[in-house]
Amino acid sequence: MKSYTIKFPHGIMFHHFHGKNHPIVQGSIGKETLSDIIEFIGIKNILNADEWAHKFQNHTLKSNQVCLTFDDALKSQVDIALPILRSHGLTGFFFIYSSIFEGVKEKLEVYRYFRTTQFSNIEDFYEYFFNYLKKFPVFDKIQNKLKNFNTAEYLKNCVFYSKSDKKFRYIRDQILTREEYFIIMDSIIEESKINLEKIYKKLWISEQDLKKINEENHILGLHSYSHPTNFATLSYKNQNEEYVKNKKHLEKITSEIFVMSHPSNSYNQDTLKILNNLKITMGFRADMNPIKSNLEIPRQDHSIITSML
């Protein structure tokens, strides 16, 4: 029987789940696959969040010990993943960005839902998006920047991304400004006539869900305030504001905020300095490069493990 090869301690990274009222979206898995992943890794190799954190901070983790992590405060994690964790007696780290709890409807998650539910497949969306760009003055800028774009080198640690995934993310994160991308996507969505209010209710967890996660002994951690996709490009002041506001919000639920994960795996030395100043002692990346510091712990994306099953 196949099993997961573990060479050093790391986290297992989850985002979207499907089932019940949650549709299949790009990268999502169902409850059966989550159970299969847990079995494949081996329950003996998965530590509860508090134990993994304690051993990490005391340098006593064994090479085969991993933890489970969940990013982005998604409702599907509560509805689909939490019952599976309960059935296995497991707890994990839940990394939360806070703006959604304070009245802000973060567009990036809405856009993600839209592109993976309103097209027959993700490649159809990419084809539509790339053609739609021709309507906007920024198209010439995009064409010029793409001349030197190397799909093999861009996001090369994210082996689960297709060439179209990488091209889309390069345009979104490296060529367009945040405002330009929003204008383009808002225009596409407006033409589609989709009901955004219904989407909002499906996407994110509530404050009550947050309290439940905390009460069930999972560990809450920082994930920035508004989840910028290119966090490293922010000024020191803006980065600091993102994490100070994020921490202030989560401290209403629990006073012990000591862990985080880097949104979109984007950070720099300013980020690490800010996190140290906020007394964050553990931080997770989104790739499997060897650990560089206590704020750069590797994580394996669940899609890599799913491909091994």
Give residue ranges: language-model regions.
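C-terminal active-site subregion of NodB/CE4 polysaccharide deacetylases
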Residues: M1-T69, K75-S76, Y111, E215, ...
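Metal-dependent polysaccharide deacetylase catalytic core of the NodB/CE4 family, i.e.
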Residues: P9-K20, R86-S266, I297
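Hydrophobic/aromatic pocket-lining and membrane-interface residues
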Residues: D71, L85
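Short active-site segment of divalent metal-dependent hydrolases/proteases
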Residues: L74-K75, S226
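Membrane-embedded segments
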Residues: Q77-A81
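Alpha-helical segments flanking ligand/cofactor-binding loops in enzyme cores
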Residues: P83, K211, L272-K273
